[in-house]
Regions:
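Alpha-helical structural modules in large enzymes and assemblies
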Residues: 1-207
Length: 207
């Protein structure tokens, strides 16, 4: 309930003097995620790179090539479009990690073919992106996919019209406990095999 000067908060308090300000838990969760991402260098750089890949693949010529590669490599599966990132809607980050993970092989192939077949700025951009997409990138992609999937589930529940303050507080508390368990567990070891398999399937740099 924002707008303490002239918005909804002020008008409600004129009618109900004991009403108190409650920040939207869904928005509050987004603010925390945004702050963390901006203040952790690895996270900030990772999501910046993910956005650069999205922008690159959105070019009309490149986009058509990306779709063609998907049809060839995954003929029986649905085409996946990469997701634009947003500071205010972190479900976009979760979706972006999900789709990038599913189509990582296609993305790497797209960058390789563009850097080899194109000329000028587009080829240079492809080589620049490809040089940054290494085993660490894959590890972070898998890590954020796992973490953001948990957070996104809670974010969606917070948007439920029937949710009240008590339910919101309980959801956030459970999420904090879940993330603490992840931090204290061997999460990296648990999915290291998946990361290793991805790295084996993808040769990042041109020989």
């Amino acid at each position: 309930m924002s707008g303490g000067i002239s918005g909804a908060q002020k008008h409600i308090k004129e009618k109900a003097l004991i009403a108190y300000y409650v920040h939207c838990y869904g928005h509050k969760l987004n603010l925390v995620l945004t702050s963390v991402a901006k203040n952790v260098p690895q996270a900030s750089e990772f999501f910046s790179l993910l956005e650069e890949v999205y922008i690159f693949a959105s070019n009309a010529v490149v986009h058509e090539k990306f779709l063609s590669i998907q049809r060839e490599m995954f003929p029986e599966e649905q085409i996946r479009e990469l997701q634009h990132l947003s500071d205010t809607r972190w479900c976009c980050q979760a979706t972006s990690c999900d789709k990038a993970l599913l189509r990582l092989e296609c993305i790497i192939r797209l960058l390789k073919e563009t850097s080899a077949d194109d000329t000028g700025a587009r080829a240079a951009s492809a080589r620049g992106l490809l040089a940054q997409m290494d085993a660490e990138f894959v590890c972070l992609l898998q890590f954020f996919f796992e973490i953001l999937r948990k957070i996104n589930k809670v974010s969606q529940q917070l948007q439920d019209k029937q949710a009240d303050l008590g339910k919101a507080a309980k959801l956030i508390s459970c999420l904090r406990e879940d993330l603490a368990d992840v931090r204290n567990s061997n999460l990296i070891e648990n999915y290291s095999n998946r990361v290793d398999d991805l790295c084996k399937n993808v040769t990042f740099h041109q020989q």
